[in-house]
Amino acid sequence: MQLNIEEKSSVKKVLHIEIPKEDVAKELDTAYNELKKTATVKGFRKGKIPRKILETRFSKDVHADLVPHLVQNAFSEALDEHKFNLVGGPQVDPPELTPGEALSFDISIEVMPELEAVDFKGIELKKTMYEATDQEVDAQIQMIRKTMATKEKVTEERPVKVEDFVLIDYQGFVDGAPCDAAPKVENYVMAIGSNTLPAEFSEKLLGAIPVKEMDIDVVYADDDKDEALAGKTVIYKVTLKEIQEQILPPVDDTLVENLGQYKNLDELKAAILDNLKKGYEQRTQHELSEQIFTDLLEKIEFEVPDTMVDAELQGIIAEAEQAYAQNNIKLEDVGLSQDFLKTQYRGVAEKQARRHILLGKIIDQENLELTEDELEAGYAEMALGMNASVDAVKNFFKMDGRQLEYYKHTQLEKKAVRLIIEQGSVTEVAPEVETEVSESAADVEDKTDQ
C-alpha cells in the first residue's frame, strides 16, 4: 500500500491511498473462490462455475462487498503506522474497483491538535467570598408564599390596582369582523402588568371598576411572531367582570406543613440557607473556571476540529429543545430553528471545545486519575441529584459503558480545574453589591415534589 499524507491544517489531514493492482487481484481471487463454493447458476454444478460466468453474474455484488473491506484494512494499516489521535470518523467517497488496476482513494480525517505542555501554575485568580444572608432567606420564603397564594374576589367597589388580578372576557375584531387569530375567550384571569396578553390590556384595565365593557386597540408589528396578527390593528372588545386579590399565606409552621417536606419553619429556613450556600459555591467555582480559561486561551492558540465544535453544538441544541419540550413547545413555535441556533451558538460551542482540549492535555500531562473514593463520592452526588440510590446509579453505568467513560472524563476535568485553582495565586475579594438574590427557592420546592 502506498500512503501520502496531505496536511490541510494542524487538525485536518487527507490520506491519499493506493492499493497495488496485485493486492487487488489477490483479494478478488479470494472473493470469487469463496463465492464459487455457494453460488448457483443454472446449467452448472455448485463449485464448478467458471470464473468468467461468476464475474458476469456477480461482479457488481463482489465489488460492493470488497471495496469497503479494502478501504477499512488500508485505513487500519495507516492508523497502526502513524498513530493518529482521531476526532470523529473518517470521511471517504467509496472508490470504483476496476479489475487489473490499482485501487486509489482519499480519506479525510480530523485529529486532536498537538499542544505543548500547558503552564497553568500561578494563574492569578480572584475568588469572590459570597455569604448567604437572612435577608436572602426571607426573600426566598416570600417567593414560596407567592407560589402558594390563593386568589379571592374583591367585593368592594374599587378600581383595578397594579398588584391585582382581573377576570375578563375578550374577543378580537379587525375592520369590524371577528378575527380568527384572536377568538373569543371567557373567564380569563390575568395579572395586571403580566405579558400574557398585550401591554395595552394592563394599561386600559388599570383604574377601571367592574363590571365594565371597553375596547382595547392593539397594533401588532409587521414582524410579530404571530404571523396571523402581524401588521394588523386588532380591536379587542373586553368585559371586566371582577377584580381578584392575591392572598399570601402567613409565614408559620402551617405554611411549612403544606410544603410537605419540612417539619417546621426553622427546618425550612435551614434548607434554604443550605441551598443558597451551595449556589454560591457553584457560582464561585464557575467564576474561577471562567478566569482560568480566559487566561489560558489568551496564551495558548490552537485549531479546533470542526467535529468537536459540531458535537458541542448538537449538545446545545438538544438542551434547548429539551427545555422547550418540557412546556410542550417546539423551537419553531418561538421563531427558532436548528440552523439559527447553530449560527448563534457556534462561538460558544468552539469555546467549549477548546476548554475540553486544554483540560484533556492537562489530564494527560499531570497523569490525573480518579481514585475509588472520588468515584464513589461522584456516584453519591449524582444519586442525590437524581433522588435515586447509589446502586441505581452504578447499575445505570454498568448497562452503558460509554456513559461511564464520559462520566469519568467529566470528573477528571473537574479534578484538573481544582488542581489549577490549588496551584494558582488566589486572592479573596468581597462581592459587589447586588439587588438580586440567588435562586434557591426553586430548589427547595423541588424537594417537596420528591
Curated annotation (Swiss-Prot):
Q: Name one GO cellular component term.
A: cytoplasm
Q: Where is the PPIase FKBP-type domain?
A: 163-249
Q: Name one Pfam family in it.
A: Trigger_N
Q: Origin, by domain of life?
A: Bacteria
Q: Which reaction does it catalyse?
A: [protein]-peptidylproline (omega=180) = [protein]-peptidylproline (omega=0)
Q: Where does the record place it?
A: Cytoplasm
Q: Where is this region: Disordered?
A: 431-450
* InterPro entries per UniProt: PPIase_dom_sf, Trig_fac, Trigger_fac_C, Trigger_fac_C_sf, Trigger_fac_ribosome-bd_bac, Trigger_fac_ribosome-bd_sf, Trigger_fact/SurA_dom_sf
Cite the record's Acidic residues compositional bias ranges: 431-443
Question: Is Cell cycle found in the keyword set?
Answer: yes
Which Gene3D superfamilies is this protein grouped with?
3.10.50.40, Trigger factor ribosome-binding domain, Trigger factor, C-terminal domain
Could you say which enzyme class this protein belongs to?
isomerase
Q: What Gene Ontology biological process does one annotation of this record name? A: 'de novo' cotranslational protein folding
Q: Which family does it belong to?
A: Belongs to the FKBP-type PPIase family. Tig subfamily.
Matching PANTHER family = TRIGGER FACTOR CHAPERONE AND PEPTIDYL-PROLYL CIS/TRANS ISOMERASE (PTHR30560), TRIGGER FACTOR-LIKE PROTEIN TIG, CHLOROPLASTIC (PTHR30560:SF3)
- Domain characteristics, as noted in the entry: Consists of 3 domains; the N-terminus binds the ribosome, the middle domain has PPIase activity, while the C-terminus has intrinsic chaperone activity on its own.
The protein's name is Trigger factor
Gene name, per UniProt, is tig
